[in-house]
């Protein structure tokens, strides 16, 4: 029902570390755990068999007439970027939950198991690995890869998960043969549907991310006494690189994009860099 969906959205938005400044809910933080437990509780209320799977992924299963057959899966993530929006990930989680409620309430028969799932650390804002939870569950990466990373408190993914009181109950890898179909409902992450007055779209491809850390070294010298012709200003070089990349990428295909996410200047003082 619309009322339940609205209540779910409001509940999720209350689990937020930055009220008034967007939604911040990083993996295994107190806000995240509150949302995590909310999902588990709602699934249990409608009779789901809830299992904490590899990487802390939630799976709420409704067995169906043939419990051994591949599952029809739906869900998303509940972690956010810093100061993010109220719907990213939440929409996919809530729609899967609400669909399961409707199936249960109306006693709709289904042959295949229905799985409502939640993947941790999909945004990568907590531990720096995008699609971390789903990649771990499906065997795309080894646990050692994500455990080389740490959150702002210095905890690895596994340490933070255990500190939050989450215990994996099924550490097996999710295989392609385990899934009949997967559906994730998602918000429009651009303006295309709105501008084109289209109500819904189906994804045909997704951005392939490539992260690069660039270190530009200059020479520090007296800010007032050093002529411009003798300066090697690292920040000025960085600005040229950023502008140059923007120009190059704008000439490529329409779907290509670039983002400069973070800058750090050392020393961050009013001197030549």
Per-segment meaning from a language model:
Residues 40-44, 53, 58-154, 158-160, ...:
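Active-site metal-coordination/substrate-binding segment of hydrolases
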Residues 19-29, 46, 220-226:
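Glycine-rich, flexible beta-strand/loop modules in the N-terminal catalytic cores of phosphate-handling
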Residues 1-29, 120:
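N-terminal capping segment at the start of a domain
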Residues 4, 8-11, 15, 38, ...:
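Generic non-transmembrane alpha-helical segments
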Residues 121-122, 128-273:
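Midchain, well-structured core segments that form catalytic/ion-binding scaffolds
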